[in-house]
Amino acid sequence: MDVIRQHGYQLGIFASSPIYRLVDLDRTAFAHVPNLRMESSSGDGSSGRDRVLTDEWINWLGKRGPSNPFFGFLYYNAAVSVEPPLDYHPTIPAPVRASEQLRSRNTLYLTAVHYVDSLLGRVLDDLERRKLLNQTIVIVTSDHGIEFDESGLGFKGHGTAYSEEQMRTPLVVRWPGRSPGHVARRTSHNDIAPTLLTELFGCANPPSDYASGSSLFSEAQWSWLVVASYREFAVVEPERVTVVFPAGYEVRGQDYRLSRTQTPPRDALRAAMQEMSRFYR
């Protein structure tokens, strides 16, 4: 964010959920953003705030100074809150073969995702109407997935496990001047900052100087990833997930079932601890 500000970008930060909760974005990523607005000013419930957020973004974009570039951050909340508008259609049927309660909630979740997608459509249509779409990098992602006990292990929601359903997120990048493509290798949110700094701002330093990731357009491979929650973290490898608690650990297989035969990956754990300590102050 400091580099973005140094390049004269106008900042439009809009969040449906308070950005000071849990991850403290107001004290980390947006610590130096002037006049930072903490949350959407109005709206009935998460879906209402998401709609207002979209209106406010479109209004802000129309009033910004056209001579300077802009950076927008739009944080939608209806999907994670599982709160689509009561009158929203279509309703997306749930594929989960589970209890009626889980099927009903999964239907609400998928419908909420469809609703947020419709709001993103408004954002993209507005950029196109202003003839800005082909001059704007657009990144769509999420901070986590949502689980509905697909594995039958009893895990639901988010922040309850390091399963595929909770860790996998969308990551869609529209980059003017680049041909459409698909990245098949494992990627991480840690790759977004190095991508922007190297590919947009021309940073010549190796990404390891300032981040734990690498450019999405490089061929760098992750042999392991660190995924963290509020009290524990996991080292994720292709064949296993090692969850480290304050007073112990557990090793799980690809299906996230507890493994009694696999041993903890000592080299990967050591490297993960060293990597996590590099930027800790």
Predicted regions and their residues:
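Membrane-interface soluble catalytic domains
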Residues: 2, 19, 125-131, 173-281
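Structural scaffold positions in well-ordered secondary structure
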Residues: 4, 74, 120, 138, ...
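Short beta-strand segments
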Residues: 13-15, 70-78, 110, 137-142, ...
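A long, amphipathic alpha-helix that forms part
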Residues: 54-64, 94-136
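Active-site-proximal alpha/beta segments of enzymes that process anionic O-linked groups
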Residues: 1-96, 213
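Histidine-centered active-site microenvironments of extracellular/periplasmic hydrolases
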Residues: 132-177
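A short beta-strand-to-alpha-helix junction
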Residues: 48, 103-116, 159-167, 178-194, ...
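Short catalytic/ligand-binding loop motif for oxyanion handling, primarily in non-cytosolic enzymes
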Residues: 19-26, 41, 79-86, 146-150, ...
